[in-house]
């Protein structure tokens, strides 16, 4: 085993200065941050017989009305007609109201002119909704089962994660967007919806069964489908086998959920200025960063990126010409990238093109930030022009940000079971929020072209699969407080790493090399990023120019340019920030590396912005 913290001495902890006024990507842009469903007494009507993997066999179907066996299983068969389906036309404050309990007729569920179809296929279950002119907000699908009580469970996140991911025991109220996996100590099973879902979906698991909630809202109101038959989601399962590593099991689940062909997986590494400059960069400083990064990168093979994050303004003294700057980055043998906020609208934009202020609820200060409604054709054209301009300047990576917040009115950590605040709607009432998000992502891809690398930040990665090359999977890391990097960066790298190479390349955010963050931590963070095969981006503040830092950067960038060593966490079921990582050594044998993320004083309970 290799130990990545050479000190391991009880040395005084390095200072982590905290500025009096911290800047984040949110606050920089003026941000002011400030399941109750149809229960059923029905029991499962289909077979639950043990198969060779210790799960519930799909093959044997028992007659309706027979009681369940007393034995509990680690695998729950959900590729069958559900045991209940309940619709909700609206949400008031925080609660769904006006439940419509549907009546089953074969694979179809009906009531009051609404129809949910549960089409059982060989390896999937397709859920569709027809509701006519009746506004529809939520669909609650329930499968009853005797679930093994000692399972540990992993869920995903709505957009970026915020340090909350992890394997935990059964928590019946836990909201698990998109997919979840279980482990009984021997076998890992997975359940999820495909990435072409047209509803915002989350799962719940308890000892009496499984729930799938399909949010079909339009803004914060019920969608009005009219004559449309909405294919809400396709449910998939990944039944594990004894002896399979849990990481491989979750990776296989992610692969099975891909509804589109994933973009080519290529090494992504280089420079991003945010976590040392925090919006204070200039064209000149970007070129200096580019020269520094290129000088430490391998001369052949995949070229590094130099990404300009938030704070640039074309045609100003600090940023005189963004097209000329892109050319300057290319001349220095790097690939230029640029941060954009696609839905941001200028002051004076006609209200008819904008999203309603009501999407922010009581957070009225947020309404000062104007955003286009992407269901308005003229607003779509404004978004298209913005992206065309960036591609026309010659940028080879577009990092688009804030679209989930701008569209839905909340950050991921605020959403819980409700991604939007009730009481408002989009201009086009016939589209679900999930559909509008995918249409926006497709518009961005079409606007910049197939050759440009598209990086989604504050985006719903599950819905961006096959559209995005790269996805920021966690909230911001930091060049000002190590705790933020430990909590946000290490957590998202480890727990969402199964998405790397299946959905897209995962981007856990940058290594912010500054005086405020102890090098002994950043050195390890840099190392594990490069070895994992995830995007390895560096904000190189002045300390990065030290000899030890430059040597570590040279090694890490060389490894990242080659795609890493497929390092994966081995203690990810025991901790939210795994410290033991296994990779394939040059000899072909596995090698384990031990990292130390907390230091002698332990992790901080306090988190800076």
Residue ranges and their predicted role:
Residues 529-532, 537-540, 572-609:
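Carbohydrate-binding surface patches
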Residues 530-561:
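Catalytic cores of secreted or luminal carbohydrate-active enzymes
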Residues 22, 42-71:
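C-terminal segment of N-terminal export signals and the immediately downstream linker at the start
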């Amino acid at each position: 085993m290799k130990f990545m913290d050479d000190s391991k001495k009880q040395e005084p902890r390095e200072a982590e200065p905290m500025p009096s006024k911290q800047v984040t990507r949110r606050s920089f842009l003026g941000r002011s941050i400030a399941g109750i469903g149809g229960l059923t007494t029905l029991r499962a009507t289909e077979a639950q017989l043990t198969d060779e993997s210790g799960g519930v066999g799909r093959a044997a179907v028992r007659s309706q009305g027979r009681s369940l066996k007393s034995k509990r299983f680690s695998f729950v068969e959900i590729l069958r007609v559900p045991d209940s389906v309940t619709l909700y036309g609206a949400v008031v404050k925080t609660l769904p109201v006006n439940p419509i309990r549907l009546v089953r007729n074969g694979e179809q569920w009906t009531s009051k002119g609404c129809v949910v179809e549960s089409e059982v296929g060989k390896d999937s279950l397709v859920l569709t909704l027809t509701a006519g002119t009746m506004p529809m907000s939520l669909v609650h699908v329930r499968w009853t089962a005797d679930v093994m009580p000692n399972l540990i469970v992993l869920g995903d996140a709505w957009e970026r994660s915020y340090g909350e991911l992890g394997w935990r025991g059964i928590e019946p109220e836990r909201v698990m967007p998109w997919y979840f996996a279980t482990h009984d100590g021997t076998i890992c099973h997975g359940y999820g919806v495909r990435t072409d879902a047209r509803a915002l979906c989350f799962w719940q698991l308890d000892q009496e069964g499984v729930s799938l909630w399909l949010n079909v809202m339009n803004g914060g109101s019920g969608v009005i489908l009219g004559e449309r038959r909405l294919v809400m989601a396709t449910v998939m399962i990944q039944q594990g086998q004894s002896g399979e590593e849990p990481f491989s099991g979750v990776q296989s689940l992610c692969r099975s959920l891909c509804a589109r062909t994933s973009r080519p997986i290529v090494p992504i590494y280089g420079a991003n200025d945010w976590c040392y400059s925090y919006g204070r960069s200039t064209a000149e400083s970007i070129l200096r960063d580019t020269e520094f990064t290129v000088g430490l990168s391998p001369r052949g093979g995949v070229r590094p990126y130099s990404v300009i994050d938030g704070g640039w303004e074309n045609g100003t003294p600090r940023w005189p010409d963004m097209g000329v700057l892109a050319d300057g980055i290319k001349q220095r043998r790097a690939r230029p990238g640029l941060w954009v906020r696609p839905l941001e609208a200028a002051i004076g934009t006609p209200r008819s093109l904008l999203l309603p202020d009501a999407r922010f609820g009581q957070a009225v200060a947020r309404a000062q930030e104007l955003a286009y409604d992407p269901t308005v054709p003229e607003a779509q054209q404004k978004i298209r022009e913005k992206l065309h301009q960036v591609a026309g300047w010659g940028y080879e990576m577009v990092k688009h940000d804030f679209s989930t917040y701008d569209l839905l009115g909340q950050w991921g950590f605020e959403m819980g079971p409700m991604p939007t605040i009730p009481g408002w709607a989009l201009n086009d009432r016939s589209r679900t929020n999930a559909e509008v998000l995918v249409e926006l992502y497709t518009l961005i891809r079409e606007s910049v072209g197939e050759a440009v690398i598209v990086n989604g930040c504050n985006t719903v990665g599950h819905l961006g699969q096959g559209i995005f090359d790269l996805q920021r999977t966690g909230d911001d890391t930091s060049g000002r407080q190590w705790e933020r990097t430990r909590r946000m960066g290490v957590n998202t790298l480890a727990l969402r790493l199964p998405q790397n190479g299946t959905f897209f390349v995962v981007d856990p955010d940058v290594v912010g090399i500054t005086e405020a963050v102890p090098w002994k931590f950043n050195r390890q963070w840099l190392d594990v990023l490069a070895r994992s095969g995830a995007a390895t981006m560096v904000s190189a503040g002045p300390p990065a120019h030290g000899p030890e830092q430059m040597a570590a950067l040279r090694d890490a960038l060389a490894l990242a340019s080659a795609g890493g060593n497929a390092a994966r966490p081995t203690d990810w079921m025991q901790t939210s920030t795994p410290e033991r990582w296994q990779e394939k050594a040059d000899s072909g044998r596995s090698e384990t590396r031990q990292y130390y993320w907390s230091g002698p004083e332990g992790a901080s309970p306090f988190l800076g912005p």
